[in-house]
Amino acid sequence: MQKKIIVYTDGACSGNPGKGGWGALLMYGASTREISGYSPATTNNRMELSAAIEALETLKEPCIVHLYSDSSYLVNAINEGWLKRWTANNWKTAAKKSVENIDLWQKILTLIKLHDVTFHKVKGHSDNPYNNRCDELARQAIKNNR
């Protein structure tokens, strides 16, 4: 039986592009693990995607994952079928432009094949303590690398 994991993720950028950080919470039963990271030159969208990638890469076996993010870019790409269309169109948008962050999207595609992942949109910077904690982790990662 696969483990059921709840994941919250967030990314932040000081300037866009600029220095960036990401944070994630992984919850299984009564256990919570916090992870975070930093990039010296990035964008907010790359940090949002990186948070999801790093969280999913942390899992050591296939799991049932409910991933919560305040990133419409991440959640809509999965739930609205953008990612499927991009891959079907050889990584081109509906406007025939190259999709940004292809390297990260390819990693996400690989990871969501390993796990049973459901993506959920949460409101950012509101009263969700888990999302707020991920935001703190992401901002702290930037601050720690100034």
UniProtKB/Swiss-Prot annotation:
Cofactor: Mg(2+)
Keyword Ion transport: no
Domain of life: Bacteria
Residues engaged in binding Mg(2+) 1: 10, 48, 70
Cofactor note: Binds 1 Mg(2+) ion per subunit. May bind a second metal ion at a regulatory site, or after substrate binding.
Catalytic activity: Endonucleolytic cleavage to 5'-phosphomonoester
GO cellular component: a single term: cytoplasm
Family annotation (PANTHER family): RIBONUCLEASE H1
The protein's role, per its UniProt record: Endonuclease that specifically degrades the RNA of RNA-DNA hybrids.
Protein name, UniProt field: Ribonuclease H
Gene: rnhA
